[in-house]
Amino acid sequence: AAIQAGRAGAKTLLVERGAQLGGTTTTGGVSFPGLFDAWGKQVIAGIGWELVKESVELDGGTLPNFARVPQRHWQNQVLTNQFLYALLAEEKCTKAGVEIAYYEFPQAVTKTESGWTVNCVGFGTRRRVNCKQIIDCTGGAEVVGMVGFSRLREEERQPGSYLYRLGDGHEPGRTRLNRLYVHGADSTNSR
């Protein structure tokens, strides 16, 4: 969202709680995004796909053949190098004129006549941002909750994924990705 806003000419600030962009694909270590296809053709494109495609190309990888419909949908997930993905995301933000505030998060959001005031905090820093629009990509709809809107929680939630390797040392990146899904794991948090 930040890259598109920047490309469209909007003055954009991306407030990132962590050390890198990319969320679950990078910091979360689930570096096999999907799904970009259905019924034997690619159906999803855009900036997310641009990042995935370029990270695979830079890493010397290959993309799945979306014309082939696999027995299991996960067989068309794209194995990416999460480190390249994070670097590409930052590079694209920079080229689009997006300012990035790492290690910061919104503490309070207030409605104003002209939009919103967002108070952000981080290690040794505070900032007050006046803006016309807010896009909440926190994963838990934290900003949505701060402004007083209700958030939904389904009875059955998507389980978390746990990635590990036994034996040789871990070599991150697309070529050594081993994954295990724990179906039915409780993905609730402390809220």
Question: Across the structure, where does each feature detected by a protein language model lie?
Answer:
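N-terminal Rossmann-like FAD-binding beta1-loop-alpha1 element of flavoenzymes
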Residues: 1-13
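Surface-exposed charge patches
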Residues: 3, 91, 142
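Anion (oxyanion) recognition and catalysis
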Residues: 6, 94, 145
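Conserved N-terminal/central alpha/beta ligand/cofactor-binding core
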Residues: 10-11, 16-108, 112, 152, ...
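Flavin (FAD/FMN)-binding glycine-rich loop and adjacent Rossmann-like elements that form
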Residues: 24, 86, 103, 122-133, ...
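N-terminal glycine-rich phosphate/pyrophosphate-binding loop and immediately adjacent elements
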Residues: 92-99, 119-120, 136-139
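Conserved beta-strand-loop-beta-strand element in the redox core of flavoprotein oxidoreductases
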Residues: 110-128
